[in-house]
Amino acid sequence: MAGSKSPKGEFAGRKLLLKRKASRWHHYKYVNKALSLKLKADPLEGAPMGRGIVIEKVGLEAKQPNSAIRKCVRVQLIKNGRQVTAFAPGNHAINFIDEHDEVVIEGIGGPSGQAKGDIPGVRYKVVLVGKNSIRELVRGRQEKVKR
């Protein structure tokens, strides 16, 4: 701030403060934080988990250098009707999830709430199918309730 355009002198404190306040709005991270844009864009609206209905099962190709089809599901959230893609973690976990099932999703745990690993654009993972934990279903400790 000690450039040629900055006010100098004994009583320049207030002017420097106002100039710094105005300059902060040129930084995108400050703008996002001040206007809470991350919360507005979040499909879960700041909640740690969300319930939704499975619309379809999808297989996503892993990013290079890996070669795999990651099993995911498209979920429509009950609270606001938004659609998100959620990863089905575990071996053959996709077999326990059917269309029109109610699932609970949570963040996948990527950096800054973004995608994790080689799954492109997937920020969420399935935690519960109906009332059963997906981990317990995969391990065979629980059975999915037939309606």
UniProtKB/Swiss-Prot annotation:
The record lists the lineage as:
Archaea, Methanobacteriati, Methanobacteriota, Methanomada group, Methanococci
In terms of Pfam families, this protein maps to: Ribosom_S12_S23
What keywords sit in the KW lines?
Answer: Ribonucleoprotein, Ribosomal protein, RNA-binding, rRNA-binding
In its UniProt entry, the species of origin is given as Methanococcus maripaludis (strain DSM 14266 / JCM 13030 / NBRC 101832 / S2 / LL)
Q: How does it assemble?
A: Part of the 30S ribosomal subunit.
> What is one GO cellular-component annotation here?
small ribosomal subunit
Kindly give the CDD domains that the UniProt entry links to this protein.
Ribosomal_S23
Mention one GO molecular function: structural constituent of ribosome
Q: Which gene encodes it?
A: rps12
Q: Which domain of life, per UniProt? A: Archaea
Could you tell me what this protein does?
With S4 and S5 plays an important role in translational accuracy. Located at the interface of the 30S and 50S subunits.
The text of the family note is: Belongs to the universal ribosomal protein uS12 family.
Q: State what protein this is by name.
A: Small ribosomal subunit protein uS12
